[in-house]
Design a protein with these regions (language model features):
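Alpha-helical transmembrane segments and their immediate juxtamembrane cytosolic regions
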Residues: 1-391
Length: 391
């Protein structure tokens, strides 16, 4: 956003400056998140198998690691939304702010569901290998055909599963080391890039890989098979340099820094937009001229280093203060709920998060639906044994 005549103006840089859309091919990194997640889930499942840990115990540990940092963010914004409501702030304003702050949570709404299915998808990978990946990709392609050709738009929302499950399978391939030489990996990358290029320039898909200036059409809302192609492109390119990166990380200091960042990565991800909102509010009340610059102008670009510096000044202390929630291990003596109970609670968490990521607090298609979504997340957390009140 920027300030014009003393008021905030919400705008889309991709719509105002369409020539910048190519940057989204670089900065759309969600496929990498799911690929790394697939690798991590494979490692975790292998460890659980060696230790004789059953599904319920494994799932309890994974949910604790994922949901605990999320609850802090939701609690904070839930309290703030209530304070804004009783202060007389317009519901649309509260919705705009909270929706922006909670956008990162959509990832967990999908990833938690994928984690619950990980034992099945990993078994499918072990049995069928790349055929399991191709089967999911084919299903995703069929859904896109239904979306565009048959105009069954509602089916597009199922792509949150098919697209991201396909990309997640790449993480299993990485873990198994069945990818070949760096040259072969670069071939994967070129194949992904060529497929993405063909889909966009010969198909109905928009160019932008983050958001879209095209009304009602996006590669991400809901996901499209273009994200699979982008994921393959990124996957091949990054893994082609895995060996030199491993040598680089043999340095004790670099490895220690990597471990430190990994221990707080969920905090960084979940809170970065909240910090951006804080910086915007501070700059607005400080009459900061940075906010009066129209996005995309040369002056606006010149101010980006200062803007990023302000973000880091607030984000870094917060990152070091909050990871206690992220790093805190699940108590060894904590009872483990039965698997069906955990699954039911996790589904409730996913549904509540999905709603809040889409609509935020303060305004709802039906009255009090935002409150119901928040309560659903809390109740699901209790049901899954993630709250101290669990017995």
């Amino acid at each position: 956003p920027w300030v014009q005549d003393g008021s905030f103006v919400a705008g889309d840089l991709l719509e105002m400056r369409p020539q910048m859309q190519w940057l989204t091919w670089i900065f759309q990194v969600m496929p990498i998140f799911f690929i790394v997640g697939g690798y991590a889930n494979a490692v975790s499942l292998e460890s659980a198998h060696r230790k004789g840990t059953r599904y319920a115990g494994w799932l309890a540990g994974r949910l604790h690691r994922l949901v605990t940092p999320l609850l802090g963010l939701l609690m904070g914004w839930g309290v703030l939304a209530m304070a804004l409501y009783f202060s007389g702030v317009a519901g649309d304003t509260t919705r705009l702010v909270t929706r922006a702050a909670l956008i990162p949570t959509w990832f967990l709404a999908i990833y938690i569901a994928i984690v619950m299915l990980a034992p099945l998808t990993y078994r499918a990978w072990q049995r069928w290998g790349f055929a399991s990946l191709l089967g999911l990709a084919a299903l995703a392609a069929l859904v896109d055909v239904a979306f565009f050709v048959a105009e069954l738009r509602w089916m597009g929302w199922t792509q949150y599963f098919w697209v991201w499950l396909t990309v997640h399978q790449l993480g299993y391939a990485w873990r198994d080391g069945r990818l070949g030489s760096p040259a072969r990996l670069l071939g994967w990358s070129l194949l992904g890039f060529a497929t993405l290029w063909a889909l966009i320039f010969n198909g109905p898909y928009p160019f932008a890989m983050v958001g879209s200036p095209d009304e009602g059409l996006s590669n991400t809302l809901p996901p499209k098979i273009t994200l699979i192609a982008l994921g393959v492109c990124q996957f091949g390119l990054l893994l082609s340099i895995e060996a030199p990166m491993r040598r680089l990380l043999s340095s004790v200091r670099l490895w220690a820094a990597t471990v430190l960042i990994n221990s707080m990565i969920m905090t960084l991800y979940l809170w970065h937009i909240t910090v951006m909102i804080v910086v915007v509010v501070i700059a607005y009340f400080a009459a900061n001229s940075v906010l009066t610059l129209e996005p995309g102008t040369s002056e606006w670009w010149a101010s980006r280093p200062l803007w990023i510096l302000l973000l880091y000044v607030i984000l870094l202390p917060l990152t070091f203060a909050l990871p206690g929630l992220e790093r805190r291990p699940r108590p060894a003596d904590a009872p483990t709920p039965a698997a069906p109970r955990q699954i039911g609670g996790a589904i409730m968490i996913c549904l509540g998060i999905a709603y809040l990521a889409l609509f935020g607090f303060g305004s709802a298609p039906l009255p009090y639906l935002d409150i119901l979504a928040f309560v659903t997340v809390v109740a699901g957390s209790w049901l899954s044994g993630l709250l101290h009140g669990f017995r």
